[in-house]
């Protein structure tokens, strides 16, 4: 269970960071 929870936590963090970077690049392109 602990390994599964850690995996989902890492996956969620990676997804959040990727989304943040994508949004940042989109804003830079718009400017």
Curated annotation (Swiss-Prot):
Q: Which keywords has UniProt assigned to this entry?
A: Chloroplast, Electron transport, Membrane, Photosynthesis, Plastid, Thylakoid, Transmembrane, Transmembrane helix, Transport
Gene Ontology, cellular component aspect: chloroplast thylakoid membrane; cytochrome b6f complex
Q: Where is the protein situated, by its record's location annotation?
A: Plastid, Chloroplast thylakoid membrane
Q: Which gene encodes it?
A: petL
Q: Does the keyword Electron transport apply?
A: yes
- UniProt cross-references to PANTHER family, sorted A to Z: CYTOCHROME B6-F COMPLEX SUBUNIT 6
Which family, according to the similarity comment?
Answer: Belongs to the PetL family.
Report membrane topology: Single-pass membrane protein
Q: What is this protein called?
A: Cytochrome b6-f complex subunit 6
């Amino acid at each position: 269970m602990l390994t599964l929870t850690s995996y989902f936590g890492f996956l969620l963090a990676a997804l959040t960071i990727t989304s943040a970077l994508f949004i940042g690049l989109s804003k830079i392109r718009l400017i």
